[in-house]
UniProtKB/Swiss-Prot annotation:
Residues 1-10, 222-248, 504-515, 628-647 have a biased composition (Basic and acidic residues). The gene is USV101. It is found in: Nucleus; Cytoplasm. GO terms for biological process: melanin biosynthetic process. This is C2H2 finger domain transcription factor USV101. It holds the Pfam family zf-C2H2. Residues 27-54, 66-84, 261-278 have a biased composition (Polar residues). Gene3D superfamilies: Classic Zinc Finger. The keyword Ligase does not apply. Transcription factor that promotes pheromone gene expression, which results in a subsequent increase in cell fusion. Also promotes production of melanin and capsule and thereby is required for full virulence. Disruption phenotype: Leads to growth defects at high temperature (37 to 39 degrees Celsius). Lacks the ability to engage in cell fusion with the MATa control strain and fails to induce pheromone gene (MFalpha1) expression upon mating. Significantly lowers the virulence. Reduces LAC1 induction mediated by nutrient starvation and leads to weakly reduced melanin production.
Length: 647
């Protein structure tokens, strides 16, 4: 909306100005007037609702001496309503202009707008011969010019376009909705009803049908008022039609570029194409609901797109590559220009266009890039730094453990496969992890299928083995987390074929069958020598040799079950363990018997169960069988004594 100049009409709701209540109107003339020159068509910003073909926007200034070639146009005094068109408060009922309202409006005397001769002539478009340049399709017809609202001199090609434009100045909204919201244009109300009140279709149709005569009446009245006010201007048939232009600011941009050309040459910034920074042209509405956009030549986006733009981008910009190559110094040693500094980079570091074509790079991009020496392959990881070739680093089994940086990277070509017929040895080491090479199939040079490799100092193993202590350092190609055990051949080393399923192993490695043997006679509570117990059980151990030679007899419950004496009972300390093992392994259950407690049992009664020797293989010795018979006799005697007491 235009602002009103203080010298012009400041009361543009047709209210009286101070001291002009009875102002004299100008001489009325015919509405069909020729095109004036003193008050020509001003180039002002078009309203958002108007399309470019509706508004007359001349761009070229008139030739010297031709701005007053036509006599000034006298204005017709207005005798219409106070607010044109009439504005009524929106209400629920729809209205039509009544005769009473029209009579009241006609009684008010409204001064006419000031004469156009009082204003300075505005720039208009003329040919070199002095003919005005008009919009396309208006030659020999009429144009409708906005007058009386400050400096607004917009020209429209249709009467209804001028009528709805005037409502922007007056603030009139003659089309109310049933929700209470009013609009200045009927098409805006129709769109509002279709979107906001889409579910009230019947009510919308009734409302629009009632507003149709209002719209027709407003159009007729606007046409009459436009002729009365001299807003209808005939266009001579010889007028030159203005060429349809896609960019309205091209001429102004060319003049500005020519005026500032000398200063732009020394500017530190690139010269961009002015047409790329202008707002897009207003679309031309079509009858089918779409828009026609004028053709915009893409002359500046084909060969000079920027590094972050694509040739099809409307926001792309162009620049002069010569400026970037010469105006800035090289940013890294050995780089002459920004194009050379990044020309050897691979794709992720070099800007490319959508078609795969390399794009020039501005100098400010290369200011932040690393030196040219950094464009080689990526640096090696510090984990593998300073590593000599594997062939030049023999294994050292007595040196301190090297750091992680000494481990060479895995390279299949550097480590030949093992010889034919080689199989990894069984993991006989108890308490250690398997060698790292067995787990990862990693064979360093010098590996010949033995672990650890034979030393050259005459001993069967390297330094540190056989002394009962771990070696001083692990081999260099071995995992630093591996547990190194003592000499496997030394006495006390666990069994070669250790079975982890064994629940218990003996301490003396075959010298005794149990940890704490029992006395062989009921009267003797002393623990006999382990050799005696072993000799007593030798007959039973002989027929059942251990499956693994060299391994001590383990838990007998793991062996196949053998026939048991149903009356045999183990010692108290052995009952729970043996029963638990039997229950887990499915052995025949043993009948639990309570320990006899007699007053005259004495030491024999107290140690009656200690005379048995538990054979882990399920056999009962002769001494144990004798003790069982004696215990049975004692029980019978105790039972007889109890019977006598009860009798």
């Amino acid at each position: 909306m235009s602002f009103v100049a203080p010298d012009d009409r400041a009361y543009y709701n047709y209210s009286r100005a101070p001291g002009s209540a009875h102002g004299v109107g100008h001489e009325s003339t015919s509405p069909d007037q020729r095109l004036p020159s003193s008050h020509s068509y001003n180039k002002s910003a078009s309203a958002p609702n108007e399309s470019p073909n509706q508004v007359y926007h001349p761009e070229m200034a008139g030739p010297p001496g031709s701005s007053h070639s036509y006599p000034p146009q006298p204005m017709t005094p207005l005798t219409g309503s106070t607010a044109y068109p009439p504005q009524h408060p929106p209400s629920g009922s729809y209205y039509l202009p009544t005769q009473q309202q029209q009579q009241q409006q006609s009684e008010q005397h409204i001064p006419s707008p000031p004469s156009s001769s009082n204003r300075p002539p505005s720039a208009t478009g003329y040919t070199p011969d002095g003919q005005p340049i008009i919009p396309v399709g208006v030659s020999g017809g009429k144009m409708f010019r906005c007058r009386g609202y400050g400096d607004c001199d917009k020209v429209f090609t249709r009467s209804e376009h001028l009528a709805r434009h005037v409502r922007k100045h007056t603030g009139e909204r003659p089309f109310p909705c049933h929700c209470g919201k009013a609009f200045s244009r009927l098409d805006n109300l129709r769109q509002h009803a279709a979107t906001v009140h889409a579910e009230q279709a019947q009510l919308n149709e009734t409302m629009l049908a009632s507003l149709a005569p209002i719209h027709a009446a407003l159009s007729q009245r606007a046409s009459r008022e436009q002729r009365r006010r001299g807003e209808v201007v005939e266009v001579p048939k010889g007028a030159v039609e203005r060429r349809r232009e896609t960019r309205k600011a091209q001429a102004a941009a060319a003049q500005a570029a020519a005026a500032n050309g000398h200063s732009q040459q020394n500017s530190p910034y690139a010269q961009y194409h002015e047409s790329q920074w202008n707002a897009p042209p207003h679309p031309r509405p079509r009858t089918n609901g779409g828009y026609d956009y004028p053709y915009v030549p893409e002359h500046s986006l084909n060969d000079d797109a920027g590094p972050s733009r694509r040739p099809s981008s409307s926001a792309g910009y162009g620049y002069q590559q010569g400026y970037y190559d010469s105006a800035r110094p090289p940013t890294a040693p050995g780089t002459g220009s920004s194009g050379e500094s990044m020309s050897g980079l691979p794709y992720p570091y070099r800007p490319m266009s959508a078609s795969g074509r390399e794009l020039p790079v501005p100098a400010h991009y290369s200011e932040s890039e690393p030196p040219a020496t950094a464009h080689g392959p990526p640096p090696q990881s510090p984990m593998y730094g300073n590593v000599p070739p594997a062939q030049q680093q023999p294994p050292n089994w007595s040196s301190p453990p090297p750091g992680h940086g000494a481990y060479p990277p895995h390279d299949a070509a550097a480590y030949p496969p093992p010889p034919e017929g080689y199989y990894h040895p069984a993991h006989a080491a108890h308490g250690s992890y398997p060698p790292r090479e067995d787990v990862y199939e990693y064979h360093p040079p010098g590996w010949q299928g033995q672990y650890p490799p034979a030393a050259t100092n005459g001993g069967p193993y390297a330094q540190g083995y056989g002394t009962g202590a771990p070696p001083t350092a692990p081999p260099p190609h071995e995992s630093p987390f591996q547990y190194n055990v003592a000499n496997p051949g030394a006495e006390g080393y666990p069994y070669q074929n250790y079975d982890s399923r064994k629940r218990r192993a003996e301490d003396d490695f075959g010298k005794d069958d149990r940890k704490h043997p029992r006395p062989s006679s009921p009267s003797n509570s002393q623990v006999p020598d382990s050799s005696t117990a072993a000799h007593a059980n030798g007959a039973h151990d002989a027929p059942h040799p251990h499956p693994h030679p060299g391994a001590a007899p383990g838990n007998g419950a793991m062996d196949p079950p053998r026939p048991h004496d149903p009356n045999w009972l183990p010692a108290t300390s052995e009952r729970r363990g043996s029963l638990a093992i039997s229950a887990l392994l499915g052995s025949p259950p043993k009948t639990m018997r309570s320990r006899p407690s007699t007053a005259d049992g004495g030491a024999a009664g107290a140690h009656g169960y200690e005379s048995y020797h538990y054979d882990p293989h399920g056999q009962v010795s002769d001494d144990q069988q004798t003790g069982v018979d004696k215990e049975r006799e004692k029980k019978e005697e105790v039972k007889q004594q109890d019977d006598k007491k009860t009798q």
